[in-house]
Amino acid sequence: LDDGASLTELPSLDLYRMPDPFRRPRLSEFKDRYDVLEYAVTSLATFAEPLAFSLRANRELARRSNDFDIVHDNQCLGYGILKIHRSGLPVLATIHHPITVDRRLETKHATTRWKRFTKNRFYSFTRMQTKVAQKLPRILTVSTNSFDDIVADHGISPDRLHIVHVGVDSSQFIPLPEVPVVPGRLMTTASADVAMKGLAFLLEALAKIRTENPDVHLVVIGKPKYDSKATALIKDLKLENHIEFISGVPDEKIVELYSTAQLAIVPSLYEGFSLPAIEAMSCGVPLIATTGGALPEVVGDDGVTALHVPPGDVTALANKIRWALNQSSLRETVGQQGRLRVISNYSWHSTAEKTVEHYYALLDSLEQTNSAGGTK
């Protein structure tokens, strides 16, 4: 954290912690009613953290309401956030994309009826998020695509929704020309091993390409889940020796890894924005990205700042990778133009400035409302 920021941790049961997710807590771990609620909701196969965290946050802020001018909720959207709003503390929320999209994709790609049922149970908290989002006066999102999806899925009035792009530190995510490129190296980031991220499609494409080019291999920033489709595919396609998962490394190492790659891939079925895409572009690595969700508006024109493929199409993805590996001049040009696009459009400084503008706009609108109502 910056020296000017302090962190208040809100203890929880941490029921999803590794290596024992969905554990049964000891009785001595239950300290209050929110711990009981967290365990009870999780026992019903529903993701409890948005509700439990928001209620704990409301309790903490009720004790310290005079310490803060505004509360910025980062897509928790639990009932506790609504309580904070109703207490009189100004609340602004960021919704990167509606989690209802994740729910649809996860249930669509579930392989059995039981898995579809459990996915629907897990994502049932999205109904709460819709109710809370509809009550908040000002919401930020990160792309035009997310804007449209939030309006459609959450039923939010467009005049309460505003776009502020997220960014990347282009002075940190930089090309490293002194680092040698490894022939055939592809790189991707899987922030979560879920259907929406499209890793399974990339693995199938990799297997296709390797029948012709045995040098092709994949580096994944992230961890596979032990029971995921991707984990099963790696074994079924005999890719164990041709894929490497790396996690828990600093940004400096990620930049170095990008510099060794011939291509970066974002195979997602949907993205509300995609930080991995602009991080790769900022490093000057030529990017292949699907047209899922907001990716086309983020990465720019096909063949200019990135290369596009349709989402969920293994053959198209394999063909694009195969073709791009044989186009050294195009890769260099796309990599250079991609970095220029990021520098021109996506900086954290700009994100911060625009976010602060919305803080003031929210405070001003509330002051006007209170003045009109005769309150202070």
What is each stretch, according to the model?
Residues 145, 167:
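Carbohydrate-associated surface elements
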Residues 177-206, 219:
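Conserved donor-binding/catalytic core segment of Leloir-type glycosyltransferases
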Residues 230-249:
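Nucleotide-activated donor-binding/catalytic signature segment of Leloir-type glycosyltransferases, i.e.
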Residues 248-249, 256-261:
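Short alpha-helical donor nucleotide-sugar binding micro-motif in glycosyltransferases
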Residues 269:
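Aromatic "clamp/platform" in nucleotide-sugar-dependent glycosyltransferases that forms part
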Residues 301-302, 306-314, 323-328:
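Conserved acidic donor-binding segment of nucleotide-sugar-dependent glycosyltransferases
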